[in-house]
């Protein structure tokens, strides 16, 4: 017998970084960062891992159904060659395998669409372009990720590029906590029916990829690398280099956080804390939240009108965009305690400005009135809620002058401001405003303070200083038009 004639053909062979992603044991893994790393191929193939098990069920998701077409095309190319007897039902969007296993393709255009999966169970769930999803959608599907029968491995996988409505929570969950390839382990406490507590752990990991991890693409399309390099700077940083700090759709592209300049306060919006002079005016901004986080920020104004965010109180559980569910009186108590316990704020005259919605009396006593009662005595002034004007005040203040000084700077202790502001993206429908589905509570609270202290547009936008170039490579570079 000629073994060459009967050798099984190779349908798909993973490249190095794809193989690294596919061999990870963690229940959650994110693959991606830059464009061209072969992310979608790896996700489509990973779903095949258990199709020999009759009761195996898998689900691959994109935000909208039209976006699924590329994934379905990939499945048509790979699945039919690997399993000639497998059949795709275009009406139900499901692959049926000879064993009885099924791989579904689904979408979740709106958060309410998650109920379409209520009561379902999937051994494998894959998200393509995870940053297009909100945390509530992803976390809900974690509850659908459960065994459909004995012997299956239960896990979730996702791929993505930076940018999108979910950029902030994806970055916070997978990118920030640990270096790439390092397991992120969280511990949870569960109270059992008998009253005892059980400690549980769950791990996740981020595996980066880029076009440089996909030699097959570089060989087949040498011009693709040049196409990425020619993109606008924000898109190039995200799609070519996988930067999570600069991406398409980012609202405040001016934002800079440079620890090298925390002390001299030049060319950075984040600075080291310093003593606040007694004569500087102090403002307190407030955005109420119950199921979503509430936000309080304290600002000091210097003689030039520059604002410094010197302290913050952010009412979140630690999960993305999830509030503490505490009432206005308790929020007022926490704000008052924060001011009494802070030597910079204690005894100061503080001007409070808040979301005008807290003055609404249509359903009884207003939130503002509750917070002003004894013993907290917090007084608020209704803030100017003009959204686009407020957004422009952000742009004006984030602009650097010729000396590298902006008109808004933030103490590096204000972690939630630093985390959320650069992640804000534009609304796809109202393209001049930010998308309000995001974690925008700090942005809103700060906006009220900025509108209380409006400044004129800067005479001109100042370019950032050139990057450090000790080898003089940038100056010596030559660019040719082809």
Task: Go through the PLM ranges and name each one.
Residues 297, 305-438, 454-482:
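Mg2+-dependent endonuclease catalytic cores in nucleic-acid-processing enzymes, primarily RNase H-like
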Residues 1-27:
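Pre-P-loop entry segment of helicase/translocase ATPase cores
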Residues 66-123:
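Inter-Walker segment of RecA-like/P-loop motor cores
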Residues 56-68:
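Conserved RecA-like ASCE P-loop NTPase motor core of nucleic-acid helicases/translocases
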């Amino acid at each position: 017998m000629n073994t060459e004639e009967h050798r099984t053909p190779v349908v798909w062979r993973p490249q190095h970084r794809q193989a690294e992603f596919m061999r990870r044991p963690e229940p959650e893994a994110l693959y991606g960062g830059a464009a061209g790393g072969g992310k979608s191929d790896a996700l489509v193939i990973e779903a095949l891992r258990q199709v020999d098990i009759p009761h195996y069920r898998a689900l691959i998701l994109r935000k909208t159904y039209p976006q699924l077409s590329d994934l379905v095309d990939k499945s048509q190319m790979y699945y039919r060659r690997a399993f000639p007897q497998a059949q795709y039902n275009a009406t139900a969007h499901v692959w049926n395998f000879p064993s009885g296993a099924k791989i579904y393709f689904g979408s979740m255009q709106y958060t309410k669409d998650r109920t379409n999966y209520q009561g379902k169970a999937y051994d494998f769930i894959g998200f393509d372009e995870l940053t297009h999803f909100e945390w509530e959608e992803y976390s809900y599907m974690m509850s659908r990720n459960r065994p459909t029968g004995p012997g299956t491995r239960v896990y979730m996988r996702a791929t993505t590029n930076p940018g999108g409505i979910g950029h902030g929570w994806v970055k916070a969950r997978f990118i920030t906590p640990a270096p790439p390839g390092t397991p992120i382990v969280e511990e949870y406490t569960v109270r059992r029916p008998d009253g005892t507590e059980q400690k549980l752990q769950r791990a996740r990991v981020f595996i980066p990829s880029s076009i440089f991890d996909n030699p097959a693409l570089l060989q087949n399309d040498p011009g693709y690398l040049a196409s990425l390099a020619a993109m606008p700077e924000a898109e190039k940083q995200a799609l070519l280099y996988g930067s999570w700090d600069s991406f398409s759709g980012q609202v405040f592209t001016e934002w800079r956080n440079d620890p090298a300049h925390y002390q001299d306060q030049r060319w950075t919006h984040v600075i080291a804390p310093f003593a606040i002079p007694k004569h500087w005016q102090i403002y307190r901004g407030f955005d109420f939240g119950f199921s979503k986080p509430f936000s309080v920020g304290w600002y000091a104004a210097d003689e030039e009108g520059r604002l410094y965010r010197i302290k913050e109180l952010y009412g979140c559980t630690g999960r993305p965009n999830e509030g503490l569910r505490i009432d206005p009186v308790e929020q007022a108590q926490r704000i008052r305690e924060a001011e009494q316990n802070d030597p910079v704020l204690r005894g100061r005259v503080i001007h409070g400005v808040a979301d005008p919605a807290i003055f609404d009396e249509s359903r009884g006593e207003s939130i503002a009135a509750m917070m002003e009662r004894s013993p907290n005595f917090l007084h608020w002034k209704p803030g100017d809620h003009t959204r686009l004007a407020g957004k422009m005040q952000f742009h004006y203040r984030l602009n650097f002058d010729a000396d590298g000084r902006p008109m808004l700077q933030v103490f590096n202790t204000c972690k939630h401001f630093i985390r959320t502001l650069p992640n804000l993206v534009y609304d796809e429908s109202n393209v001049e405003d930010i998308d309000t589905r995001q974690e925008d509570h700090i942005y809103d609270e700060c906006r009220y303070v900025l509108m209380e202290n409006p400044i004129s547009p800067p005479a001109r936008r100042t370019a950032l200083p050139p990057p450090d170039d000790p080898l003089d490579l940038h100056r010596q570079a030559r660019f040719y038009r082809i």
